[in-house]
Amino acid sequence: MKGGKRAQQPAKQNAHRLNGEIIGVKEVRLTGLDGESVGVVSLNEALDVALTAGVDLVEISPNAEPPVCRVMDYGKFLFEKAKAAKEQKKKQKQVQTKEIKFRPGTDIGDYQVKLRNLTGFLEEGNKVKVTIRFRGREMAHQNIGVDVLNRLKADTEEFAVVESFPTRIEGRQMIMVLAPKKK
């Protein structure tokens, strides 16, 4: 890459202190590999237990008296934690707002196609913003736009809830927001 230097990012600090990093304490409350409590032991004893097991001594709660340490494979622990966070993120559904535009003179065929798309969006769990756009002399017949919105409201009442219904026209359009019903 030509040009400037890339900024060096500092190495990530571990959230927990490991093996030789645990200093300033003489005794620790030790938890074994399978989660059972060993009791209060000296720091050197705890390090020996971790060394003989071939894993790490990890300081879990440094503020406790005495500090709580656990014998575990730290790399595996971090991997499991990252895997759990990834699973949690995957389960979290991102709700999007889709928009469908109508005109006061939208014919029945176009209306049916747009209604089918709208129901598809709602079944996916997305919110739908329905916009009625007015042009020219259509502004004088706003009641036709309200009729279209009421018809949509009636056609989608079994699987959608109206979040906001327009009380008046905003600029040259009316906007209604539909949300999927909770199952």
Curated annotation (Swiss-Prot):
GO cellular component: cytosol; membrane
UniProt GO MF annotations: ribosome binding; translation initiation factor activity
First-listed, main subcellular location of the protein, grouped into a coarse class: cytoplasm
Keywords: Cytoplasm, Initiation factor, Protein biosynthesis
Cellular compartment(s): Cytoplasm
Transmembrane stretches, start-end: none
GO biological process terms, semicolon-separated: ribosome disassembly
Entry-linked Pfam families: IF3_C, IF3_N
Role: IF-3 binds to the 30S ribosomal subunit and shifts the equilibrium between 70S ribosomes and their 50S and 30S subunits in favor of the free subunits, thus enhancing the availability of 30S subunits on which protein synthesis initiation begins.
Similarity comment text for this entry: Belongs to the IF-3 family.
Record-linked PANTHER family: TRANSLATION INITIATION FACTOR IF-3 (PTHR10938), TRANSLATION INITIATION FACTOR IF-3, MITOCHONDRIAL (PTHR10938:SF0)
HAMAP family per the UniProt record, alphabetical: IF_3
Complex and partners: Monomer.
Protein known as: Translation initiation factor IF-3
Gene it is expressed from: infC
